[in-house]
């Protein structure tokens, strides 16, 4: 069945994970350690959260890579026994989201890719475990917000990855069947979300948190980055006939 909609993950798929969320997370952890007057705990905190400083990579199954910013910050605040409660957590979530959104380094060329997909009649969506406002900020910086048909974050009311809700919401927004949707992402949770929703095609990229070895068993195809997506669509005759109608 031809693909009629492509739902992309954001971090590690469209933008450089290291430049955005890793940098913002390290800064947040350092700040929290300073608040706790425990700078010596920084290395332990980020290591236990899934960051390998020697390899400069995140564990692809960690909360930092797959979960929400709020869950990560809550874990750190709890481990450091910081006072401040909900106000501190929300303040640090907002700060980390803003830092990540201010450092947007595109992977391949999302703007050109999205324009070509739209010209072919495909609906384009972005589903992220970031807050929706953070996602929209990043997409604006990439210059693609105006051509994206659907954006959702962990707070948009469609559940979280690896559940099917984000894919199904994309389908509802664009009058698609799950079998007509290709999901593109860089983590096991992205691929598991695709399977849970019954998406037609699950494509993993190795430009983010996970290696091909981790992703291969969970998806239909592993590619290096989104720059290889169009040749894959062409080779497997997944392009639809040109048309662009969506409710």
PLM features per residue range, with description:
Residues 64, 105-106, 127, 158-159, ...:
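Residues that cap or flank secondary-structure elements
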Residues 3-111, 116-120:
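N-terminal helical cap/lid subdomain that shapes the substrate entry/recognition surface
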Residues 1-6, 19, 34, 111-119, ...:
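Asp-based, Mg2+/Mn2+-dependent phosphohydrolase catalytic module
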Residues 13, 128-130:
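Conserved phosphate-coupling serine/threonine residues in phosphotransfer and NTP-handling enzymes
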């Amino acid at each position: 069945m031809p693909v009629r909609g492509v739902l992309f993950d954001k971090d590690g798929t469209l933008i450089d994970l290291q430049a955005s969320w890793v940098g913002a997370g390290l800064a947040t952890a350092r700040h929290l350690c300073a608040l706790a007057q425990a700078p010596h705990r920084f290395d332990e905190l980020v290591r236990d959260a899934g960051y390998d400083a020697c390899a400069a990579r995140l564990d692809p199954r960690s909360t930092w890579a797959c979960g929400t910013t709020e869950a990560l910050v809550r874990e750190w605040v709890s481990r450091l026994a910081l006072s401040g409660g909900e106000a501190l957590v929300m303040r640090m979530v907002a700060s980390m989201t803003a830092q990540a959104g201010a450092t947007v380094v595109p992977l391949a060329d999302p703007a050109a890719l999205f324009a070509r997909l739209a010209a072919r009649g495909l609906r384009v969506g972005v589903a992220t475990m970031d807050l929706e406002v953070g996602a929209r900020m990043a997409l604006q910086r990439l210059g693609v917000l105006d051509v994206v048909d659907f954006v959702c974050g962990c707070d948009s009311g469609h559940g979280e990855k690896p559940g099917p809700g984000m894919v199904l919401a994309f389908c509802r927004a664009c009058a698609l069947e799950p079998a007509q949707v290709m999901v593109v992402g860089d983590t096991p949770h992205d691929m598991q979300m695709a399977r849970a929703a019954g998406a037609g095609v699950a494509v993993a990229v190795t430009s983010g948190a996970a290696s091909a070895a981790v992703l291969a068993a969970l998806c239909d195809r592993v590619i290096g980055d989104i720059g290889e997506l169009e040749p894959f669509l062409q080779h497997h005759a997944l392009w639809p006939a040109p048309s662009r109608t969506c409710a």
